[in-house]
From Swiss-Prot:
Positions of ATP binding: P142, T143, G144, C145, G146, K147, T148, L149
UniProt-recorded Gene Ontology molecular function terms: ATP binding; ATP hydrolysis activity; ATP-dependent protein folding chaperone; protein dimerization activity; unfolded protein binding; zinc ion binding
Keyword match Ubl conjugation: no
Lineage: Bacteria, Bacillati, Cyanobacteriota, Cyanophyceae, Acaryochloridales
Subunit structure comment from the entry: Component of the ClpX-ClpP complex. Forms a hexameric ring that, in the presence of ATP, binds to fourteen ClpP subunits assembled into a disk-like structure with a central cavity, resembling the structure of eukaryotic proteasomes.
Protein name per the record: ATP-dependent Clp protease ATP-binding subunit ClpX
Domain ClpX-type ZB span(s) in chain numbering: 1-51
Family listed: Belongs to the ClpX chaperone family.
Lineage: superkingdom: Bacteria
Length: 447
């Protein structure tokens, strides 16, 4: 060993070559085996923190998926479309057509995965000359009709990674905003950074109509948040090997990328597509004549829904989606607007119904919350008038319950046992009242 070699030391901890077992040389720097072990511990801790910060619905299935990953899925283990729809029915009211479309798509997605994981003998039995290609889905419907809720409910029951992304933050590569590869990064995080597991997943892209081309005619200026995003999504939707930066590409430009094959990743896109019915009217010539009165609002919505069922790919192109993008999403489903009857059901029937949520909140303070049937109807009518779908329901109930939830924790729990919501409270925007249940009033004999 030369005199120079005897003075080599780790660039991180400063220990000499004689004090460590191994000294690894780099371009102008050295690192010892002890520092390498320390780096591995730090990385393992960061990965654990990342998994712990994920939502419980996304984090819980990870260990179970890892246990079942090595074994191919059999047809008996794949959830049937009826089972998937039944689960959706417990959480989402109405939208039967969209539920059927999603149930069939998820079922076929599982079957593709079962074939890709099967052994060579099994594949031969299934006729490996036929390759099953995926059919991406487009959900079209007004705001607050349940597009995102359908996707979130699917994520709770599926045995594959499921990620939800927002298209409004995406921009073309090189511009301020998120790259399209960040969509795959979310899926990778849900899969606990397991590439093989992420390649089996499903991605829901919300607000996809916001990346529509700003003008039907090409402009001399670049549309970096519209057509540019659609162009960047093309190969990802069809199936390609994408380079995904594990820490995001903008703030850490020199990191090593992870390669993910999107061939078996199912993409579900959703958007409101405001004004699309007008484009269909111009093409079909079924335009309604005359003025719409307030009493005819429901009939107008029905005509709009019927018009959207005549949707063709050329209408989406007219709206601003490029032909290459629409061609990669062959399955299109229209989600109906919510009427008063459906809004009443949404308030009371689902497993996580809004009324049940507030009843549970007040029950924790030993107060029984009761909504009279005509109050439920009044809340649904007001939500229908606001034209924001089911999102208006929570806003209205919050207005009514605000003062009660503010005063209740400070009141004596022995005196307050009931909270009643009436129709007049909803119509007059008055706050709910806390009542003493008759059974809680002490009689002279008991006193």
């Amino acid at each position: 060993m030369s005199k120079y070699d005897s003075h080599l030391k780790c660039s991180f901890c400063g220990k000499s070559q004689e004090q460590v077992r191994k000294l690894i040389a780099g371009p102008g720097v050295y690192i010892c085996d002890e520092c390498v072990d320390l780096c591995n511990e730090i990385l393992d801790e960061e990965l654990f923190d990342t998994a712990s910060s994920m939502p419980a619905a996304s984090r819980a299935p990870v260990a179970e998926r890892k246990r079942s990953q090595s074994a191919p899925l059999s047809l008996n283990q794949i959830p049937k479309p009826r089972d998937i729809k039944s689960y959706l029915d417990e959480h989402v009211i109405g939208q039967d057509e969209a539920k059927k479309v999603l149930s069939v798509a998820v079922y076929n997605h599982y079957k593709r995965l079962s074939i890709s994981q099967a052994s060579a003998d099994s594949v031969a039995e299934l006729d490996d000359a036929i390759e099953l290609q995926k059919s991406n889905i487009l959900l079209i419907g007004p705001t607050g009709c349940g597009k995102t809720l359908l996707a979130q409910t699917l994520a709770q029951m599926l045995d594959v990674p499921f990620a939800v992304a927002d298209a409004t933050t995406l921009t073309e590569a090189g511009y301020v905003g998120e790259d399209v590869e960040n969509i795959l990064l979310r899926l990778l995080q849900v899969a606990d950074l397991d590439v093989e597991e992420a390649q089996r997943g499903i991605i829901y892209i919300d607000e996809i109509d916001k990346v529509a081309r700003k003008s039907e005619n090409p402009s001399i200026t670049r549309d970096v948040s519209g057509e540019g995003v659609q162009q960047a999504l093309l190969k990802m939707l069809e199936g390609t090997v994408a380079n995904v930066p594990p820490q995001g590409g903008r703030k850490h430009p020199y990191q090593d990328c992870i390669q993910i094959d999107t061939t078996n990743i199912l993409f579900i896109c959703g958007g409101a597509f405001v004004g699309l019915d007008k484009i269909i009217e111009q093409r079909t010539g079924k335009k309604a004549m005359g003025f719409i009165q307030d009493g005819e609002l429901r009939a107008k919505e029905q005509r709009t829904a019927d018009m959207l069922r005549d949707l063709e790919a050329e209408d989406l192109v007219k709206f601003g989606m490029i032909p290459e993008f629409t061609g990669r999403i062959p399955v299109m489903s229209v989600i109906d607007a919510l009427d008063e009857d459906v809004l009443c059901q949404i308030l009371t029937e689902p497993r996580n119904a809004l009324v049940k949520q507030y009843q549970k909140l007040l029950r924790m303070d030993r107060v029984e919350l009761e909504f009279q049937p005509d109050a439920i109807r009044a809340i649904a009518q007001e939500a229908y008038r606001r034209r924001t779908g089911a999102r208006a329901l929570r806003a209205i109930v919050e207005e009514i319950m605000l003062d009660v939830m503010y005063e209740l924790p400070s009141q004596s729990r022995k005196e307050l046992t009931q909270c009643l919501i009436t129709r007049s409270m909803v119509e007059q925007r008055s706050t709910a009242e806390l009542l003493v249940h008759p059974s809680a009033i002490s009689t002279p004999e008991s006193a």
